[in-house]
């Protein structure tokens, strides 16, 4: 199979994930370089996130939508977000301690946010596969789903960069972005459930 440009961007996004995780986790095993490792990991994450928008845009614009892209693009997105959640939680959770939002509160908030995100993504993917296999119907991505993706990207960037670039904010930016991510993750999840439910119900 000859890969087109959107497909190559999707594969490139997957290839970037381990590099992003390695740079973020390196300070846990190394003795220094946390600031630069976090900056580099954030840049890699942002580049990977941009390819998510580019591959879909190019595929639609140039008529290069393929079955490979339909399958791998959302899978690559989930690998990226899941990898980011795991890496942040495993990175010694190096956030600035603060009287505003303590490390413990932020850790617990992000942990539960991560659980909700992973559960939501797996649930929606399962519903999509069941309905598609049963009736061949694909519910297109909603605006809520796109907003959800953006909140996840913003939250990950805040969690990585706020401790080193904006420590005087006392973790407030990261905490607020976690809450916003939780809200839109749940909201979009229920929206997809509502959209898929008639097909699931009729199939049963």
Could you describe each region identified by the protein language model?
Residues 1-204:
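Alpha-helical transmembrane bundles and membrane-interface segments of multipass inner-membrane proteins
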């Amino acid at each position: 199979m000859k890969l087109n440009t959107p497909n190559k961007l999707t594969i490139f996004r997957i290839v970037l994930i381990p590099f992003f995780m390695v740079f973020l986790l390196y300070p846990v095993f190394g003795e220094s370089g946390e600031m630069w490792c976090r900056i580099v990991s954030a840049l890699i994450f942002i580049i990977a996130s941009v390819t998510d928008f580019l591959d879909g845009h190019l595929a639609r614009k140039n008529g290069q939508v393929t079955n490979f892209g339909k399958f791998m693009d959302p899978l690559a997105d989930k690998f990226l977000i899941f990898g980011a959640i795991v890496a942040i939680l495993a990175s010694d959770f190096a956030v600035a301690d603060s009287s505003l939002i303590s490390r413990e509160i932020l850790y617990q908030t992000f942990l539960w946010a991560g659980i909700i995100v992973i559960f939501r993504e797996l649930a929606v993917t399962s519903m999509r596969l069941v309905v598609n296999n049963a009736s061949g119907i694909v519910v297109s991505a909603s605006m809520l789903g796109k907003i959800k993706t953006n909140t996840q990207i913003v939250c990950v960037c805040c969690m990585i960069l706020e401790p080193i670039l904006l420590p005087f904010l006392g973790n407030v930016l990261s905490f607020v972005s976690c809450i916003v991510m939780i809200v839109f993750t749940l909201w979009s999840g229920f929206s997809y459930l509502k959209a898929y439910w008639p097909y699931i119900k009729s199939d049963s």
